Amino acid sequence: ALHGAADPQALLKQWHQSLQVGGFVMFSCLGPDSARELREIYQALGWPPAGHQLTDMHDWGDMLVETGFSEPVMDMERITLTYETPERLLQELRELGRNFHPARFGALRGRAWKKQLLQVLAQRLPRQADGRLALTLEVVYGHAFKAQPKIRVNALSAVSEQDMRAMLQGARSKS
């Protein structure tokens, strides 16, 4: 998953190298507002972060340009997932991936902690009109093209005396 890449800039460079000029890349990944309800609960309880920090769509656009892509277009949307129970919510979060945050709890948690987590989720997560628990995911969409390589122009150019004479003689013979 792109949002879990340890070095997204390196991944974009690989994509850029793999494409032909005129080719394009399209992607989607989770954005920083994903599971914000869960992060707020963890923070209120003084627990380590519930997930690693996700990259903002504007930063994705900047990385695309820095990598050599052109005409990046970025967009995002928020999707609300609903769950009948806290257990089902946790099951789906586990299926989506793992917590890459460097400050995450490094050991296994016990049954008492899980029981407390389930109770807190049932009490504090927002609920829909039908009583289902709600969790927001931000999905970032992007695409960009691989442009022609740019010609590097130096501030200082060198012309040999012989080339200069040839250019001057060519200009005189045309007049």
Question: What are these model-derived regions, one by one?
Answer:
Residues 1-9, 29:
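A short SAM/SAH-binding and catalytic strip from SAM-dependent methyltransferases
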Residues 87-175:
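C-terminal lobe and adjacent flexible extensions of AdoMet/dcAdoMet transferase-like proteins
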Residues 13-15, 43-44, 161:
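Glycine-rich, phosphate-binding/catalytic loops in enzymes
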Residues 9-24:
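A short glycine-rich, Lys/Arg-flanked "PGG" loop and its adjoining helix->strand segment in the class I
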Residues 22-88, 95-109:
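Conserved catalytic/acceptor-binding region of the Class I
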